[in-house]
Every structure is written in C-alpha cells, then in structure tokens.
Curated annotation (Swiss-Prot):
The keyword Signal applies. Keywords: Nodulation, Signal. One of its GO terms (biological process) is nodulation. Disulfide bonds: none annotated. It comes from Glycine max. Belongs to the nodulin 20 family. It comes from the Eukaryota. Induction: During nodulation in legume roots after Rhizobium infection. The keyword Metal-binding does not apply. Pfam families: Nodulin (PF02451). InterPro entries: Nodulin. Residues 1-20 form the signal peptide. This is Nodulin-27.
Amino acid sequence: MEKMRVVLITLLLFIGAAVAEKAGNGKAANNPAEDASDGEHNLVEEAGGIGDAITPAEGKALISAYESARFKKFVTHCSSHVAQTCSGNDPLHASGRCHGINVPLGLSFCLFDSMEKCLGDHEAKLIDPNPGPMSAIPNSIQSQQLLIETVKFRTVLKTCTRVSAKFCLSAPNVDTSVLPACLGPSLNQCVYPAADAFTPGPPLELPPIIIMN
C-alpha cells in the first residue's frame, strides 16, 4: 500500500512539472526559489536588473526550498563553462540550439542546454520530469526526494537562464568578448542568491564597441 502511495505521488509530481513547464513557457518566475506552480513574471522588466530581482537576504531565507548539494557542487564551474560556450567563444560547442545567441530566447536555450550537459558530464544529470511509462516511475522514497529536488532545480535553472540572457544582452555595448563576464556571475547570483553562496563583484564596465568604416 505504501509503495502504491509513493508511485501515485511521484506520478502526480511528473504530471505537475510537465504542466507547469508548458504553462510558464516564455516567462520568468517571480522568485526562482518558489514552486513551479506559482507562475512566472519578467524579473528584469519589473526590477530593472538581476541584482534587484533577488536580494541576498531573500535568497538566504528561501534557499532551503530548492538548494541541492548534488547540483551546487558543480554550478559555479559549469556557469563559467556555459558562459564561454553560449557567448560564441567556444567554437567546438557553438552549434545546435546555441545559434541565435544574440537574442534572449536563443541565448537562454543555449545556457540551459549547456548547463544540463555540463551537469550530466559531472554525473549530476537533470532528470526529465515529463511523464514517462509507469515502469519508469521511481518506487522508493529516496528516488521520490531526488525527483523533487531535480524538478525544483530545473525550474530555477529555466528561470535564471532566461533572466540572465535578457539582462546581459540588454547591457550597453555588449559584444561576445564581454558577454561571458556578465553571464557567469549573473547566472550564479540568480541560482544561488544567498550572500554566503555568491558574492557579486563590482559593477561590470563594458568597453565601447568600435565600428570600423
């Protein structure tokens, strides 16, 4: 009976995650630490910048809702890597959904896909929360907890890649040479906004773009 209860709860989680992703497509969550069902808002337009969207105090209070050591261990490393990849500075990986990085939607797709791949390379793979065959549903409490962690982190990551992409592409005089310097810190601050998890540096000063006639 207990096993059946776990299976049913897990199935509902799968379905709920899939519905939440479809309902929130193209938007950004009001706070990345909140549950996926809370809906999404455009943080950049409302707050004017990534630093105002999520304060360190808010992040520290809410971080326990979605933080997972399994993912956090590699996020900083992967953020730096995907920032290079998605800025077009890594020709070996500049393919597939990384095309169109000069627009927020294309850049956010690239950031999410590249982060997913990087985490997978470090054996911290994001499990796809979309419903699958009944035989594929985890049947243990441990698997259920892992699914919950993954769904929450996946939602946070989807939100933060959209926010970071729009924020960094809206910066003045942005080009591919300075884009990584914005994307890496912005993504880290959004995913883990607690003061002790990430300390932002001084405001980024972008060099002017010289147009040759």
